[in-house]
Amino acid sequence: MRAVIQRVRHASVSIGGQVKSAIGPGFLILLGIEAADTHEDADWLCRKIAALRVFDDADGVMNRSLIDVGGEALVVSQFTLMASYKKGNRPSYIRAAGHDIAIPLYEYFTQTLSGLLLQPVGTGEFGADMQVELLNDGPVTICMDTKNKE
């Protein structure tokens, strides 16, 4: 499971010209799921994201988490994060989980993160053609991979 976490002032996702979800200050999370991912991967990633200390404290030091600041989260499924580009110039998405695996894990991820943040999490629509708008804050962008925990 891979996530690109961006600290934002605000973000929204639209489908067919209609806003589906919008958030204020917090994280826009692009989430890629592969066939080998499990609930344990989602649990680890949700805990890390909720506790990630990248918001400024009173001294201007990145020392506060999304939980600490009461920030919001918007999670958008992004199968292209699982791209393999080792061979040739056209990315392969063979590692990306199919709908039968990815949809339940995506829903589990958003429910788990919502429980940790004690508030609803905004979502896109799995498999839809979406337009994502955001205003980066910092910018602060963190990439996490449950198969490569650095």
Map each language-model feature to its residues.
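N-terminal, polar/charged subdomain of small-to-medium soluble alpha/beta proteins
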Residues: 1-88, 103-150
